[in-house]
Amino acid sequence: MPKPIGRRVLFSGYAKLPTGITATELYRVIGLVILVDMETETILEADCTLATQVARKHVAETLIGQSLKNGPEPLVRLIDQVYQGSAKKAIITALRICFDKYRSFKEGALPAMLD
């Protein structure tokens, strides 16, 4: 049976990419999107706008299944360990923005646009 859609929420974060890398020529900023199960506080899906499929897949696979219960730092440390590309700082910044949005939503600080 599929999970009820209401417990899954999508969060996005954006950060400026460094100059001199392909992703900057394509996008200027990195977009990172995570789909979170709000009951388990676990990342179900992740995607980002890096230039290569390998990098996008690696970042996604690294984040999927990770918990948000302990704040952003465990995820930041994980990315810092497993991603040694030039966009690391931008990925981490975008990840922290995603977490800030998640925390605000969880605390009820982000009202729906229809309210």
Regions found by a protein language model. Name each.
Residues 1-14:
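Short, compositionally biased leader-like segments
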Residues 16-33, 38-115:
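Active-site- and interface-proximal helix/loop "cap" or "latch" segments in soluble metabolic
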